[in-house]
Amino acid sequence: NHHPVVHTIILGSLVKLGIKLFSSLNAGLFIYSIIQTIILVSTLSYTIKFMKDINVSLKYRKICLLIYSLVPVFPLYAMSPVKDVIFGCLIIIYIISFYKLINLKGKLKIKDMVMEILLIILIILFRNNGFHIVLFSLFFLLFLGRQNIFKYIIIICITITFYYSYNNVILPHFKITNGSIREVLSVPFQQTARYVKEYKKEVTSDEKKAIDKLLNYDTIASRYNPALADPVKNEFNRYYTDDDLKNYFKVWFTQLKKHPLVYVEATIANTYGYIYPVETNWYVHIKGKKIINNYGFDYHFNKKLRPLRMVLGGFAITFPYIPFIGLLINIGFNTWILLFMLSYLFYRKKYKDIILFIPSFLILLV
């Protein structure tokens, strides 16, 4: 379940459908991409309708529509067969539903309660950390009025029950393993790699053995990339034991006491792009390695459409460097927008509306 099973089933089924109907892997991916595009377009359209429902000025709705239409991140994600697109749509719908719950005047209808539960289940199914994002934000509903508190408790209980039943009963029943723990250990792994790179002579033989049990000590320094955790964590030993993990963290803590600054440097180097607007972490794959073709498939680009593909790809690659408007797809800039809006709500003492930002900040954190 490292890559969510539900998304794998959907993507795999549609690829198989394309192969069965048209003898083409490309056709299957096209079917999936069209369905995903419809989902994204429908979600973005819903945001504009919702803005109208809460009396947002037509001027701002038009600006939103222009951004959706012209900023390349939206069409590129629409056609990318990855779990994050549908998950992103679900989070948008969840935040809107969260707004409605926060501003609910009367009793929560059973129909709306069921729809909220179904939405939460989908979020959990499409992203492993979706559970934490939803659960933490749901708890704040308990402080917003007694009228619906029992129903909110039911929603929270069902959310927790489903999450643990799915991961501890349903997936094991079908012999599906949970995602690797390495995903939540990116930060300490990067810190260890930087420590080894900078203070290799100080690493004892016992420390080497403890690190090697998890991360292949011999190559960890050369694999270390300050801005990217994948090269280090990709060598994680999936056959580790609890003792291996315990011994590693003993070493991690010992090295922290010796050189705490290197841990701080490693963390900043790996995360500063999330808060630094000058940094551009934007890449577009116009063409790439078709690894899937090594396994009996025939995935290829349409050669006749290459000129159009190059024009659209060129626009996408250039967009981040267009003055001012290029910042729209800059992660650091968007983080500062969130912080600015949060500060504004504090200034205006709109404390209830601050709760709406919890899912967005949790996504940044996890």
PLM regions and their residue ranges:
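Extracytoplasmic catalytic/substrate-binding loops of multi-pass membrane glycan-assembly enzymes
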Residues: 1-14, 27
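Short helix- or helix-capping micro-motifs
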Residues: 61-72, 92, 96, 120-124
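Short acidic/glycine- and proline-prone juxtamembrane loop motifs at membrane-interface regions
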Residues: 79-86, 126
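Membrane-proximal stem/loop segments at transmembrane-domain junctions that anchor or position
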Residues: 176-304
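Transmembrane-helix signature of polytopic, membrane-embedded enzymes
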Residues: 44-70, 88-89, 355
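Transmembrane-helix motifs of polytopic, lipid-linked glycan transferases
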Residues: 34-55, 93, 340
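Membrane-interface alpha helices of multi-pass inner-membrane proteins
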Residues: 112-127, 138-141, 156-163
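Membrane-interface anchor segments at the N-terminal boundary of transmembrane helices
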Residues: 27-31, 35, 269-361
